A protein has these predicted regions:
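Basic, flexible Lys/Arg- and Gly-enriched helix-loop patches that mediate nucleic-acid binding at interfaces
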Residues: 1-235
Length: 235
């Protein structure tokens, strides 16, 4: 069991001093009761609210974000907006970070967490967790591209693992990768003289971006969804 002020500070990013002040002011409830004691011990199943915002009670937090354009995949940046800025107070914790990167102009599924072990399991190259993207290019999608992706395209940093390209329109397709090199999809299409104009991540492992999650919105992942993300590890 942990002190109430410590939990609030760790899971919201506010200082311990401000956490104590909020508790003393009666702004914090634990399982429906106003608690004014900073050293109150919080149980594993207790629900904590700071004002109207619920504070997650799990040991770690796992967030799915529908990343919009214009945000960089970083915890902080002095000149650009980061994906962490999209996380609302009820989900924020000290130490959260984006598990993997999406370019500033790339949209779609992103996982934010404070669990380094989980991030390693889904991102390590040897785990081969598949990631699917919807892609739009400025040239027609060809059979040559499909064959090239399947056979493995040679880039400046080596030959890519086999990737699946499924044509969905004259200029659109879905690409599934099991690795994550720098600007990989853009570079792969560049080998055919094509430029990627839109890139949107649809899924990781067996988990797809929820259709009702609008750009810029996020929510906590359920245990079932976490299991789906890891369901294809090492396949």
């Amino acid at each position: 069991m942990e002190r109430l002020d410590k939990i609030i500070s760790n899971r919201t990013g506010i200082s311990r001093k401000d956490a104590k002040a909020a508790i003393s002011a009666g702004k914090v409830t634990v399982s429906g009761k106003i608690i004014r004691s900073s050293d109150f011990k919080v149980g594993e199943n207790d629900e904590i609210f700071l004002g109207c915002n619920k504070i997650s009670g799990n040991a770690h937090i796992y967030i799915v974000l529908n990343k919009p354009k214009g945000y960089v995949s970083a915890t902080e940046d002095p000149e650009q907006k980061t994906v962490i800025e999209l996380v609302p107070p009820e989900f924020f914790r000290n130490g959260i970070f984006p598990a993997g990167r999406l370019d500033k102009d790339t949209t779609g599924l992103m996982i934010i967490t404070d669990d380094g072990d989980f991030a390693h399991r889904i991102l390590a190259p040897r785990k081969h967790v598949p990631k699917k993207y919807a892609v739009t290019i400025d040239l027609p999608v060809t059979d040559e591209m499909e064959a090239g992706f399947e056979n493995g395209i040679e880039l400046s940093d080596g030959i890519c693992k086999s990737a699946k390209l499924l044509k969905t329109g004259d200029f659109t397709c879905e690409v599934t990768l099991s690795e994550g090199r720098y600007h990989q999809i853009k570079r792969m299409f560049g080998c055919f003289g094509a430029k990627v104009t839109e890139l949107h991540r649809l899924s990781m492992g067996g988990f797809s971006l929820p259709e009702d999650l609008l750009p810029g919105e996020c929510r906590e992942l359920t245990n079932e969804e976490l299991a789906l993300i890891e369901s294809k590890v090492n396949e």
